[in-house]
Regions:
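Two-component system phosphorelay core
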Residues: 2-76, 80-136
């Protein structure tokens, strides 16, 4: 079910903006809505957790550690972020973090770096979907 609400835009013209539901958010980011709903039972709780994900610094820490060549810090950040993504059923993003985390676990920063662009794209898609959902 799609919902719409009206807002006044520039010069007071009435325009419609789509309200994104939590389920639509998960669809947009290729996450597993049914799984997260079975875990937390309540869309309001899920939405609060989505809001907290926006402020999570794990991806930035991963990027910084990778840039500095710090394998241990990169592994810690990737492992933390992957755990959060698993808990929130961010299936697509989690899938891009798996090879990075495992490469870093083995100390192979070059292999992890090869997958960072894909992870960054999925991270951006996930954040974009969450931000659209949080506008409600």
């Amino acid at each position: 079910m799609q919902s719409f609400f009206c807002v006044y835009g520039f010069f007071g013209r009435l325009k419609e903006r789509k309200i994104m539901t939590v389920k639509e958010c998960y669809s947009q980011m290729n996450g597993d809505y049914n799984n997260v709903l079975s875990r937390f039972y309540d869309e309001a709780m899920i939405k609060r957790l989505l809001g907290r994900f926006i402020d999570d610094t794990s991806f930035r820490a991963l990027e910084q550690a990778m840039a500095e060549g710090d394998v241990q810090a990169a592994f810690n950040a990737a492992h933390t972020l992957r755990g959060v993504c698993q808990s929130l059923s961010f299936t697509q993003l989690c899938g891009t973090l798996d090879p990075i985390t495992e490469a870093l676990r083995g100390g192979n920063i070059a292999a992890a770096a090869a997958d960072m662009d894909k992870a960054k794209r999925e991270y951006d898609v996930t954040l974009s979907a969450i931000r659209a959902c949080m506008e409600n």
